[in-house]
Structures are given as C-alpha cells and as structure tokens.
C-alpha cells in the first residue's frame, strides 16, 4: 500500500512539474511583431511641465516660465535580453516631440517579437541624414518647418527649441529667453545618442504592444552637469562654446519612468 501511495505522490509531483513547465513555455513564447509606443512626459525637476502657466526656479535662482519645449528624437534601436539589437528603419526614424502641440508620443511600428531591455535613440538629426540634402529628408523636413525646428536648410535643424521668460536677482524685469540647439550645417555637430535601461522588460508579440513612459526633465537643459546662466546670456543659438554644452545637458534629461506591458486592446 505504501508503495502505491509513493507512486501516486511521485506521479502528482511530475504532473505539476510538467504543467508548470508547459505554462512557463507558453508565457515566454513571443512571436510575430507589434508596435512599441514611447510616451515622453516633460517635467521640470519633480513637477509636471505646464507651459506659460507655472514658474520654476533653478539652482542659479533664476525663475523661468516656459512657453515652448520641442525636441527631435531619432534613430531608435531596441536591444533584447539576448543582446540582439533591432534597428528601426532609418527613413522613418525622425520625430518631433512638442509640448506646445501636445504631440509627445512616438509609435515605432513592426517591431519583432522579443523581450526588450534597453533603448537607444538620438537627440537631433545625424550628419548622415542631413548630408542627403533637402530632397533626402522626405516628409520630415515639412514636419520640422511646421514645428519651428528649422533655421534654414543651410543652417540646419533645431534639435531643441526651448523658450520662455525669466527673472533673476540681476534681471528683475521679465525677459524673454531662447535656447535653440542644433548642428548648424555640417560645421558643428551637436547630435547626441542616449541609451537607457528599461528597468522592466518590454514584451513584444503579435498580442502585446508595450508602452514605454519616459520623463524628459527640462530643468537639465540649463541646470544639468553644465550650468548655463540666462542672466549672462538669454539667447543661445549658434554658439560654438555654449551650444555643445546645451547638447550634452539635453541628452542627459531623459529617464525611463516605467513600462506598461499589455495587449493593444488593453491600452
């Protein structure tokens, strides 16, 4: 009798083990392709960015009211848990995110199924794309012009368009500021790339299309690793000294807040 009980117990354990293994295999089986949505949530420090209605004070005791925050993101690459990288189609990989228009979402289509652990993207337009000439820009040239992200074709794209007003201890009257950063043709290359760990795996399959929520901290543009005082210079555009510092600060303003995994119907 004891032998029968022992056999039944072993059979039960094996059945549970096989069942669990089967469930695990099903849970990790990702096939097909789907979209990955990137939500850029603009902030100032720990506060939400509210254009024209809220004021923010930086570490240099300058109080800013921000009226525009537009930036170009491009050249997306996703790396999976096996160390394999999927590079998004280059011609389709240029986007303007604009707090002004409310267009802060980037949708990457036709991403192969997988478990993705990090994302890489550019801030701005790379020289390879720019040197294709105006005829090689496709629809993105029109998008950039319509969102105030161009100087002229010869001068190039504005990678960042950051505007508003400010006051400080030395500038007591409300004063306009403008920070426009770009590569200025091919003579000064301010294009930067950012790589971020997702923290939580982004799962892509024919039934799963994750949303990655990123935070862009506008405070870092002037108050990041490189401190830039509006009281000293309230307009920064074609500056061989300060524009590269703005580019470095801007590239550092992005973090991943969280990843939402789910089916398209559940979003």
Please give the residue ranges for each predicted region:
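Bacterial N-terminal signal peptides that target proteins for export
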Residues: 1-9
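C-terminal motif of bacterial Sec signal peptides marking the signal peptidase cleavage site
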Residues: 16-19
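A short, solvent-exposed, low-complexity linear motif enriched for acidic/polar residues
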Residues: 21-267
């Amino acid at each position: 009798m004891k032998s029968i009980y022992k056999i039944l117990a072993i059979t039960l354990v094996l059945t549970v083990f096989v069942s669990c293994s089967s469930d695990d295999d099903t849970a990790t089986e990702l096939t097909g392709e789907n979209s990955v949505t990137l939500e850029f949530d603009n902030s100032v420090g720990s506060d939400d960015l509210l254009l024209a209605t809220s004021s923010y004070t930086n570490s240099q005791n300058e109080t800013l009211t921000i009226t525009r925050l537009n930036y170009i993101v491009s050249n997306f690459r996703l790396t999976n848990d096996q160390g394999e990288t999927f590079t998004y189609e280059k011609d389709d990989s240029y986007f303007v995110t604009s707090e002004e228009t409310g267009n802060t979402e980037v949708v990457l289509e036709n991403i192969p199924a997988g478990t993705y652990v990090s994302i890489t993207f550019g801030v701005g337009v790379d020289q390879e794309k720019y040197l294709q000439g105006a005829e090689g820009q496709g629809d993105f040239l029109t998008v950039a012009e319509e969102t105030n992200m161009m100087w002229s074709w010869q001068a190039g794209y504005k990678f960042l368009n950051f505007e508003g007003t400010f006051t400080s201890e030395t500038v007591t009257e409300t004063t306009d500021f403008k920070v426009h950063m770009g590569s200025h043709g091919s003579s000064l290359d301010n294009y930067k790339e950012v790589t971020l760990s997702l923290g939580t795996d982004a799962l892509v399959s024919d039934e799963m299309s994750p949303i990655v929520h990123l935070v862009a901290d506008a405070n870092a543009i002037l108050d990041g690793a490189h401190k830039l005082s509006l009281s000293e210079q309230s307009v920064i555009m074609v500056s061989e000294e300060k524009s590269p510092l703005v580019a470095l600060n801007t590239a550092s303003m992005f973090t991943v807040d969280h990843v939402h995994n789910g089916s398209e119907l559940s979003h």
